[in-house]
């Protein structure tokens, strides 16, 4: 059998007898032959364009971390023909819809997307899926949208973990305050991550009957009106759970008012959060590794599109617990 015949069978082109196809496929199966994707892409000078659709990171420290991870992946995979275009929206739904319409009109091989506004994100993804290209979500998972990959934290389990951290060492009845701090344009009733974290938090106490009695109070505070916090809210409170990265707002109030003996659990390694963690005001921060999410999101598209590999559509990041004694070591470990 000639080399040309084998080449036509492997690349599925030209006319070849069924007998020769069976012979070549048997040898491929026996020896585990794999097509050299790199060589093929180089030979045809193939390019892969990915779109990244994220909130603007100016004034939003959290969103710089996934961008750092994306940039690292972009540099690493650029020699294999991968290029990335960025699309940013301001932190309001009008800006989001405007940029979403722009992204929908353009053609890419893959999309990395962080859903922030629930209804708008569902509508955008439902429309974008019609393009039939790979999509990866980071930070938040919209379970209503099927066949879309997600790389990020299991929000329900992270809330469950927060409940466990708050309950440690408590021997008698305790009072817990859940402070829900949002921007004016956010709605906790429609924010999937928020809901899942709070649901997981309550589930821990419900499922563990051996715990002492805990009493729960919820308050809603707008980020733009930080003076809504009052000392009265914290009377008799033993612990505070803030289900997002704005835990530093509560920590600042507690420190300035010299409120003692209140355990605080929140999320994310923002500088202000780390400062209060180091001061001993915040007890625990749950880290969702946003830089790794960004890197792994692009890596997912690279493996699926460039390497033609089968990849998992659901990858949960480990739940890392940061305390005063270990956060500096965590900061030293980079991608």
Q: What are these model-predicted stretches?
A:
Residues 110-129, 215-271:
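Hydrophobic alpha-helical
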